[in-house]
Amino acid sequence: LDTLVKALQTDTALEALAARLLYIEQPFARENTWNFDLRSLATTVAFIIDEADDSYDAFPRAKILGYRGVSSKSCKGLYKSLLNGARAACWNKAGEDFFISAEDLTCQAGLAVQQDNALVAFHGLKHAERNGHHYVDGFANTPALEAGSFLAAHSDLYEKSDGIVRLAVRDGTIATESLAVPGFACALQPGDIGPHNEKHDIKEHVT
């Protein structure tokens, strides 16, 4: 890592990369994060934790080691994300430069991506990783009535093509205006997506 940081500072072949580099995410495996002090390197490059953010005290612990940021992911916990955002804002009042990044973990079309977008917006972030649509084709096997209901309620966020409702990505951006509604970023009520009449037998297996 030391060699990489020095190369970013001195290698002319890396000038364009260095000029565009915002931060280096999770430079070590989660289990090794706490074994290395990055304060000497962090004067020129910002480092953030991602996978190592596995507890409510992870960000403050990482701060001591020179990390300046932490990722926000719904799957890691809404309240943890809010707490870390408050921490960064508090520390920055002292003239420091800590931040939250918006990362993804395959948030699917529907509530998952909508609520994560709302969380990102709450933090005031304009750039976010979105990769769920790379792994699952829109609403995929979701019942057509349900997918259509989401499309009708959030027509700025979704579009329909080739018979499938998908996230509407235009020039690298997605619209979020329709998410500003009561109900945590969803304009639908449970009954709006149609009745669920399928019956499933639940069997208990005792070993």
Where are these regions (language model features)?
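Catalytic core of soluble alpha/beta enzymes
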Residues: 1-111
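Flexible C-terminal active-site loop/helix
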Residues: 94-99, 103-207
